[in-house]
Amino acid sequence: GGSRLANLNYYAEDLLNPYQPKQVVIYCGENDVVHTDKPSAKEVLSRFKQFFNTVRTKYPNANISYVSIKYSPSREEYWPIMKKVNLKIKSFLKTKKNTDFIDITKVMNDENGKVRKDIFLEDMLHMKPEGYQLWTKVMYPYLK
């Protein structure tokens, strides 16, 4: 737990070398935002771009899919920067071929647009199985 984009970049070769992926799905960035170094949205984007470029260089035809940062109730104070990071990564991916931005935030909201707390464990950070079932419905169409 607690993985950050810096970890993906550090371990990129170990993570990627054993495979010849047709698709790389990335869910990372939430822990970057809340880490003690408190990076800006621009810095988190920079870290993402570094990993993106590593994947793209090694596997030029692989589809790269990014799963948006979720808005955990326990991290509500960070939602504004998380929203900025999501927008920056989404905008970046729009300029690249063979990419997807998978927005899982909307499916986690109730009918009033508020984050559903009932899909989270007591810590209000990690999800219950119901939360992951919602993600599955959103993500499945993107899987290659």
Regions found by a protein language model. Give the residues of each.
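Membrane-targeting and insertion segments and their boundary/processing signals
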Residues: K22, G29, D37-K38, P60-N63, ...
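A short small-residue
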Residues: C28-V33, S68-K70, R116-I119
